Amino acid sequence: MRKRITSMITVISLTLCGTIGTYPHNANASAKEAFEDISKRSECTKVFDNDNGTYTAYSNTAPIHYLNNDEWKEIDNTLIEDSDDYYRNKDNSFNIYIPKEYSLGKNIKNPVIMNYDTFSLSTSITDIKMPDRPEEETFSEGVYADINNEVYTTIDNSAIAEGMKAALKKSASMATYHSIVEDIDLDIAVHNASVSESIIINKLESLPETITYSISVEDAIIKKTEDNRLQLIKDNEAVLILSPFTISDSSENVNVMQVEYDLTESEEGYEVTLYPAETVNRMSSPVMPLSLGSEYSYDRPFSTVYNSQASLHPSIIIIT
């Protein structure tokens, strides 16, 4: 089985807050599954009624809810069919549209689309220059996506309420395009507050000299920061951030290096040209496959506001 490397921003690391409220407890009451108190939701927290006079709160490291008309809705990143050309994540304020068919070339039919608030971005790989390979051989006629809605298949912690486990299992999904170029695959992973792309290079002789992305934005500009991130700015505020591009190998200790790139303006918006071969040439004995990764995440204030006016004061905090 080929080892795959994917960039996953959502870390399932939970803070379990026990004994939030203490009420009369009936010791003879039969044990029941804890149920969620929806009125106590926050962006990153669920609160469960244990049906014995106590509550348990679970605080995730990434959002598990989004605010919709003053109501905290549960995020569901299951990829579902949206149209003849696209899949989309089922329920999130960060709306992602994944093409059913991915093809390389200057005339992009179906780019990846990201919508958040009033912001919209579309992106696609337009060019991969391979060593000693004619350009026409690098463009694929179209590769169909393999969809994986079970990125998190098991969460082995008996202390976690089933409702929380179900929410975590819906927090990530992935589309894989096999052989967009010979010996090169593409993974696009959807998370609760980000989208990551990983270009999987399976053979060293197929390492591209350059990879070019086209990025289009509506009523916004893109700037490169001193730390090699890209900021997508609208109304003088950064609304989306693209992390530095990195390439990593499959060695036990994992060699990771930043990939140099150029940002230029184009008729469609912007072009980002990466130089992976230059980077890998500086690696010491890289182990295949390689993964060239990037991640788009929206810039958001961390929110802990509850729908309910109830104040929660946990007396026991367990870190798992």
Swiss-Prot record:
One of its GO terms (cellular component) is extracellular region. Hydrolyzes both carboxymethylcellulose and xylan. Probably has a role in hydrolyzing oligosaccharides derived from cellulose, which are transported across the cell wall. The gene is celE. Residues 1-29 form the signal peptide. GO terms for molecular function: cellulase activity. GO terms for biological process: cellulose catabolic process; xylan catabolic process. The lineage of its organism: Bacteria, Bacillati, Bacillota, Clostridia, Eubacteriales. This is Endoglucanase E. It is found in: Secreted.
